[in-house]
């Protein structure tokens, strides 16, 4: 199936939602089929020893007065594949996307990449159906051209060292299209990114790495770039931030995580303040998935987060205010993150407000360039949402705190294509920024 406009996409998407049967049932952790609580550590594990586990983490930083805490965290050592196939039709690049159910999606069905599969999925550990189109990404054929292939991190607050392989492959061959998939023009994908809870996280992270093209949503080609900081200066700043923020993290038994308790009545793990997140259990039925029923733990955040880039025109070029951000589970300790990335409801009473949070929350309507609520990874997180914003902050000073710097959209796009440099929330915003008509152009 190949659609030509947004209306055609929504008609196809509604049809796919009606074609399948899904049911997600909240279930106590101690009743999850195939899962158990380790009596020695309290960790929640699958009886096969595969997939993922819920463990404890102790985190702190070596700098004076650095934060320190313990928390539950998802440990998933496997590296999955997130891949998008591109093909040109009538001079327009189209992306092969799928309508995919995930148990944590707030609206069940969202737009996923061509391939979204864990290592266990595509090696069929669970004896499920083969993953469609996986060979184009693992063993590209004669008609396939790899444009982008990088190991990228995922949510460092909730995953321990989690990475997935992000791949974009252009194909010229004939592709049989399953009814749950369709070719979407790249300009239409740009429009879909503005719809709440429609394009899933796995799609967004790959879209951030798409190659430039002359169509809508590309980074404009400029004869001369005029960034505030050149590459050497940015690397110097980023290396300095990694030296300043030297984390010490150790996995610990889940039973030894302070401030968290198991609520036996509800079968959940919760924080004593009711903040942050809960670890819950679900039973899932989905006739469109490789395995049609299963049980699993999930991380359910409390409240909606705010993720934002403040932008500013400098030297006639649109710049983004980027943060060197350390998170407990980040694979390489520090990554490039958005200007603001937090859940305001989780801020401790009396604690200092994160820099620029109030700038974002009090922005005037005319400053808002992008404002959409997106879901996070629905395979491990239950109803996790963030409000993603891009603001015109031309009244924000050029001089910024030491953990912040200004980068052009093109500079951040290049960094994002390397892998393990730009965090997943910033990659979502990067995918969104690249849809704005004047994001890199001078006025």
Swiss-Prot record:
It catalyses: dTDP-4-dehydro-6-deoxy-alpha-D-glucose = dTDP-3,4-didehydro-2,6-dideoxy-alpha-D-glucose + H2O. GO terms for molecular function: lyase activity. DTDP-4-dehydro-6-deoxy-alpha-D-glucose 2 binds at residues 157, 260, 325, 341-343, 346-347. One of its GO terms (biological process) is antibiotic biosynthetic process. DTDP-4-dehydro-6-deoxy-alpha-D-glucose 1 binds at residues 35, 118-122, 377-380. Its EC number is 4.2.1.159. It is an enzyme of class 4 (lyase). This is dTDP-4-dehydro-6-deoxy-alpha-D-glucopyranose 2,3-dehydratase. It comes from Streptomyces violaceoruber. The lineage of its organism: Bacteria, Bacillati, Actinomycetota, Actinomycetes, Kitasatosporales.
């Amino acid at each position: 199936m190949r659609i030509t406009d947004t209306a055609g996409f929504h008609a196809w998407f509604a049809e796919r939602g009606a074609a399948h049967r899904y049911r997600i049932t909240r279930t106590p952790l101690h009743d999850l089929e195939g899962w158990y609580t380790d009596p020695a550590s309290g960790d929640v594990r699958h009886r096969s020893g595969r997939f993922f586990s819920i463990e404890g983490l102790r985190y702190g930083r070596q700098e004076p007065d650095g934060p320190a805490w313990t928390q539950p965290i998802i440990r998933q050592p496997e590296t999955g594949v997130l891949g998008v196939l591109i093909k040109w039709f009538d001079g327009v690049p189209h992306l092969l996307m799928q309508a995919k159910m995930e148990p944590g999606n707030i609206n069940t069905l969202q737009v996923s990449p061509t391939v979204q599969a864990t290592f266990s999925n595509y090696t069929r550990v669970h004896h499920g159906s083969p993953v469609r189109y996986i060979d184009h990404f693992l063993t590209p054929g004669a008609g396939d051209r790899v444009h982008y292939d990088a190991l990228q991190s995922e949510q460092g607050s909730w995953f321990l060292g989690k990475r997935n392989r992000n791949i974009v492959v252009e194909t010229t061959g004939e592709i049989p299209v399953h009814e749950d998939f369709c070719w979407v023009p790249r300009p239409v994908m740009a429009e879909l990114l503005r719809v709440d809870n429609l394009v899933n996280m796995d799609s967004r992270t790959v879209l951030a790495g798409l190659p430039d093209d002359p169509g809508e949503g590309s980074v404009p080609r400029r004869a001369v770039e005029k960034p505030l900081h050149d590459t050497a200066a940015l690397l110097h700043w980023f290396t300095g931030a990694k030296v300043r923020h030297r984390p010490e993290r150790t996995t610990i038994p889940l039973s030894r995580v302070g401030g968290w308790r198991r609520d036996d009545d509800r079968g959940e793990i919760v924080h004593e303040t009711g903040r942050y997140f809960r670890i819950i259990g679900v039973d899932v039925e989905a006739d469109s998935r490789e395995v049609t029923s299963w049980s699993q733990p999930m991380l359910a955040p409390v409240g909606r987060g705010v993720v934002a880039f403040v932008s500013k025109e400098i030297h006639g070029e649109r710049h983004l205010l980027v943060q060197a951000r350390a998170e407990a589970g980040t694979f390489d300790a520090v990554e490039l993150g958005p200007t603001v990335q937090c859940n305001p409801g989780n801020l401790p009473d009396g604690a200092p407000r994160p820099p620029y949070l109030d700038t974002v929350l009090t922005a005037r309507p005319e400053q808002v360039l992008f404002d959409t609520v997106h879901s996070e990874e629905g395979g491990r997180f239950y109803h996790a949402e963030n409000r993603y914003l891009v603001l015109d902050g031309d009244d924000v000073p050029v001089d910024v705190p030491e953990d912040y710097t200004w980068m052009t959209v093109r500079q951040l796009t290049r960094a994002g294509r390397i892998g393990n440099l730009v965090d997943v929330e910033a990659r979502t915003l990067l995918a969104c920024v690249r849809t704005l008509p004047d994001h890199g152009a001078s006025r």
